Amino acid sequence: MTTRPSQNNADPRGLRNGPPVFAADGITKTYHVGDVRVQALRGVDLTLYRGEFVVLLGPSGSGKSTLLNILGGLDAPSEGRVHYLDHDLSASDDRALTRFRRDHVGFVFQFYNLIPSLTARENVALVTDIARDPMDAGEALEMVGLADRADHFPAQLSGGEQQRVAIARAIAKRPDVLLCDEPTGALDSATGVVVLSVIERVNRELGTTAVVITHNAVIAEMATRVVRLSGGEIVEIRENPAPRPASGLSW
């Protein structure tokens, strides 16, 4: 019998004073590929709190991306419930989930998905045009250190700069939560540190709950809490009493 890790330890930065942002209870996800049954998640319980910087750590195939997609309303669990504040995402229809993603969640993926024919400013403005209370696109680009590159097209930007535009696009709608799936996976170490510093700044200055998926244990050193997955299960949850700044990381 497996005992689930305790999540009741005191938070070293006092970030658990408010209600949980996400509460996942007994999340199981099963995929069927022909006659093959793949269980990506197995009875996962996890609570995320406002203002945390959480790293989901584990090897490829451990269930990290599946969990992130379920939290973000991009996928649904086969069993279990997911709540965002007092909203039961598990019982929400497609329209409600679209509204949830639009109003509350910013996504950053390994690949930037910028529109090549639009400038950095115009790529960010795609989000600000539909958000409830958006930043100005220029303000979002300044937040990620790209104010002077606002009128450049993606082809004129480095990989790290393109990822920062993607982060600007994600934060321009002022999301409550920033969900990042291997945001440094396509970048070298030095460029990855720059990108992580941007996510760190968003978490610190805007109070945005940040969740970062990675297989890189070094990146976990900057988290306030580390959730380690293996084989579709959470095998460890640990507090980090002294998170390292992104600028101090190297791999």
Label for each model-derived stretch:
Residues 1-30, 236-251:
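ABC-family P-loop ATPase nucleotide-binding domain
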Residues 20-229, 234:
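ABC family nucleotide-binding domain
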